[in-house]
UniProtKB/Swiss-Prot annotation:
Name used for this protein in its record: Beta-defensin 3
Species this protein is from: Mus musculus (Mouse)
Tissues expressing the protein: Highest expression in salivary glands, epididymis, ovary and pancreas and to a lesser extent in lung, liver and brain. Low or no expression in skeletal muscle and tongue.
Chain positions listed as propeptide in the UniProt record: 21-22
Disulfide bond entries: C31-C59, C38-C52, C42-C60
Function recorded in the entry: Antimicrobial activity against Gram-negative bacteria E.coli and P.aeruginosa.
Protein localization: Secreted
Designated gene of the protein: Defb3
Biological process (GO), any one: defense response to bacterium
Chief location of this protein within or outside the cell: secreted
Highest classification ranks of the organism: Eukaryota, Metazoa, Chordata, Craniata, Vertebrata
The family this protein is said to belong to: Belongs to the beta-defensin family. LAP/TAP subfamily.
Record's keyword terms, sorted: Antibiotic, Antimicrobial, Cleavage on pair of basic residues, Defensin, Disulfide bond, Secreted, Signal
GO CC, alphabetical: extracellular region
Length: 63
């Protein structure tokens, strides 16, 4: 059972984006701080200002 914890920690580190190399919004907390929301796609009068950490979620803000 201990191997599950190690595997989870390894995947967490492997899949986390390196924060030092990117100044873009790339997590939900940063998105909310910038006044945006995480959506599948930006619709209507919103524009994409970043991503929310996963490829299919975008950080959208009103124009």
């Amino acid at each position: 059972m201990r191997i599950h914890y190690l595997l989870f920690a390894f995947l967490l580190v492997l899949l986390s984006p390196p924060a030092a190399f990117s100044k873009k919004i790339n997590n939900p907390v940063s998105c909310l701080r910038k006044g945006g929301r995480c959506w599948n796609r930006c619709i209507g009068n919103t524009r994409q200002i970043g991503s929310c950490g996963v490829p299919f979620l975008k950080c959208c803000k009103r124009k």
